[in-house]
């Protein structure tokens, strides 16, 4: 029967990842539980919502091997409130788990291990390794433009695809398009899958963790599943969205008549300030561009109006340059611009305008991050 000693802070972190995977309102009791398996000096924590399956191994002192399942939320709530010290977990012979800490004791009800699902197998058609940092970069650069419209299920995730030696991530909600990619060390089979939003969020948390960010992640792809192996001790298996992602290359503007280059932080801060005046029903800001100035303005129903002026400058910290003699007035949803400007940490940002009528999509690039590009549709103002 299971008995082990574990560091509280180590268990807290792993339970945090597990709890995030488990659905809060799970009607099937077994899926609201976490399976704890103690063996060979490790504690394996398994959690699932049937679309995602997470397995984590942490080093513990195993006094007696065994496995049980217990409520993920209850165990997590208890352990998070305990001081940083050692905990002793002991399986009792009456379907209970005993948790002993400093001057405290809890007995939790358990469910049979036989009722907990096993992780599905995967027959990968493609597998490769990249750094966790690179993977985090392409997910963070695309996750914000995933469509939330469930009737367009093929847009409810990130399109991960391989073309020659490039590994791409792309997402769109019909109003904006985000593309980010990295170069692989060797050429592998072209392949494409749609990773659900929930799965993207969970694997991003894992790869950004301090113990993983400087390690590699192995990615295994099949037609209906994707498997991530991170730092050898963490495995995430996810179902994929069964659909076809649109050929987004047709939506990327091929030419432009003018270009704005501006300090990213100054641009982002100004947009954020002016956007305060806008209302949720119709969020729009107006950019009035000329060689000398950029005016950012907005009118908010029942709120008032606001404007801010940025003047032309070649100084690195306040750079602004618009390369066309003819002025341009164009409107955007400020949230769309803010999302892009927060996703890529670059000193400068470039906006390419292909239509003086301000109705054509706008291409956004970052000189210091050439493998991230974005397209945003303007709005009427």
Curated annotation (Swiss-Prot):
Q: Give the Gene Ontology MF terms in alphabetical order.
A: 3'-5' exonuclease activity; DNA binding; DNA-directed DNA polymerase activity
Query: Does the entry feature the keyword Transferase, yes or no?
Result: yes
Pfam families referenced in this protein's UniProt entry, alphabetically: DNA_pol3_beta, DNA_pol3_beta_2, DNA_pol3_beta_3
- Domain of life from the UniProt record: Bacteria
Q: Set out the biological process GO terms recorded for this chain's protein.
A: DNA strand elongation involved in DNA replication
Q: Which GO terms describe its cellular component?
A: cytoplasm; DNA polymerase III complex
Annotated InterPro entries: DNA_clamp_sf, DNA_polIII_beta, DNA_polIII_beta_C, DNA_polIII_beta_cen, DNA_polIII_beta_N
Q: What is its main location?
A: cytoplasm
The places in or outside the cell where this protein is found are: Cytoplasm
Is the Transferase keyword given for this protein? yes
Keywords of the record, alphabetical order, are: Cytoplasm, DNA replication, DNA-binding, DNA-directed DNA polymerase, Nucleotidyltransferase, Transferase
Q: What does this protein do?
A: Confers DNA tethering and processivity to DNA polymerases and other proteins. Acts as a clamp, forming a ring around DNA (a reaction catalyzed by the clamp-loading complex) which diffuses in an ATP-independent manner freely and bidirectionally along dsDNA. Initially characterized for its ability to contact the catalytic subunit of DNA polymerase III (Pol III), a complex, multichain enzyme responsible for most of the replicative synthesis in bacteria; Pol III exhibits 3'-5' exonuclease proofreading activity.
Relate the assembly described in the record. Answer: Forms a ring-shaped head-to-tail homodimer around DNA which binds and tethers DNA polymerases and other proteins to the DNA. The DNA replisome complex has a single clamp-loading complex (3 tau and 1 each of delta, delta', psi and chi subunits) which binds 3 Pol III cores (1 core on the leading strand and 2 on the lagging strand) each with a beta sliding clamp dimer. Additional proteins in the replisome are other copies of gamma, psi and chi, Ssb, DNA helicase and RNA primase.
Similarity field: Belongs to the beta sliding clamp family.
Annotated protein name in UniProt: Beta sliding clamp
Task: Supply the source organism for this entry.
Answer: Rickettsia typhi (strain ATCC VR-144 / Wilmington)
